[in-house]
Amino acid sequence: MAKKDGAIEVEGRVVEPLPNAMFRIELENGHKVLAHISGKMRQHYIRILPEDRVVVELSPYDLSRGRIVYRYK
């Protein structure tokens, strides 16, 4: 996982899939965010299903949106 400078990585659980490869993620602390799949995950056809545990990268500027960078097996 290539970490961007200033990005915040948190673990969460996929609550529901949304159109256009977006997902509603519930973080460990209870907050819900909107996240899309990172380019490398999309490139390698990694499937994200409801109830999957994932790592989400959040921008410090907008903590309500993020990018899924890893799916736990």
From Swiss-Prot:
Tell me which GO cellular component terms the UniProt record holds: cytosol; peptidoglycan-based cell wall; plasma membrane
What the entry lists under Pfam families is as follows:
eIF-1a (PF01176)
Question: What are the entry keywords?
Answer: Cytoplasm, Initiation factor, Protein biosynthesis, RNA-binding, rRNA-binding
User: Can the keyword Protein biosynthesis be found in this entry's annotation?
Assistant: yes
All copies of the S1-like domain together span 1-73
State any single GO MF term: translation initiation factor activity
Q: Where in the cell is it found?
A: Cytoplasm
Q: Does the keyword Cytoplasm apply?
A: yes
Task: Report the main location listed first in the record.
Answer: cytoplasm
- What binding partners and quaternary form does the record give? Component of the 30S ribosomal translation pre-initiation complex which assembles on the 30S ribosome in the order IF-2 and IF-3, IF-1 and N-formylmethionyl-tRNA(fMet); mRNA recruitment can occur at any time during PIC assembly.
Family per similarity comment: Belongs to the IF-1 family.
Query: Function of this protein?
Result: One of the essential components for the initiation of protein synthesis. Stabilizes the binding of IF-2 and IF-3 on the 30S subunit to which N-formylmethionyl-tRNA(fMet) subsequently binds. Helps modulate mRNA selection, yielding the 30S pre-initiation complex (PIC). Upon addition of the 50S ribosomal subunit IF-1, IF-2 and IF-3 are released leaving the mature 70S translation initiation complex.
Q: What's the protein name?
A: Translation initiation factor IF-1
Q: Which organism is it from?
A: Mycobacterium tuberculosis (strain ATCC 25618 / H37Rv)
